Amino acid sequence: MADIKSLDDLKSVVGDAPVAEAAVTREPVRDSLGRSYATGKRKDAVARVWIKPGSGKVTVNGKPMDEYFARPVLQMILRQPFTVANVTGQFDVMATVAGGGLSGQAGAVKHGISKALQLYEPSLRAALKAAGFLTRDSRVVERKKYGKAKARRSFQFSKR
């Protein structure tokens, strides 16, 4: 190793090291109709979601959101991405969802809306990612094992 006694000596040895490039600038992804498309998943449910600028109308499988998801909790889950991104009432959503139950379907649509929002407007990515909406929730039902009543529950045991 060369005798390095000062900062100038170090610079002469290292030379011009490549400087790390700035973060990737993402471009909006939209189709010919001005919509962004994304798929969302949760448990066994898979949702295909299209968003476009509009009045905030949400349609799921051809029905209004409050008709398809009757429980207020499920409707709140669908509204969360818009609330976090501060764009409530600015986008129309058209979603088709299949598989799983209502809770899983609501989670899948929420995941799809979040992904579509960040594709439509990349500046919203930071807020959605911080809230954890862009991450696929990988929790699924644990399989039943043989020799057990359920996934973990054992059959009743009688000592005598």
From Swiss-Prot:
UniProt keyword list: Ribonucleoprotein, Ribosomal protein
GO CC annotations on file: cytosolic small ribosomal subunit
HAMAP family found in the cross-reference section: Ribosomal_uS9_B
InterPro entries: Ribosomal_Su5_D2-typ_SF, Ribosomal_uS9, Ribosomal_uS9_bac/plastid, Ribosomal_uS9_CS, Ribsml_uS5_D2-typ_fold_subgr
Pfam family, one: Ribosomal_S9
Gene: rpsI
Keyword Transcription in record: no
Entry keyword annotation includes Secreted: no
GO BP annotations, alphabetical order: translation
Family: Belongs to the universal ribosomal protein uS9 family.
Coiled coil: none
Protein name: Small ribosomal subunit protein uS9
GO molecular function, one term: RNA binding
Species assigned in the record: Cereibacter sphaeroides (strain ATCC 17025 / ATH 2.4.3)
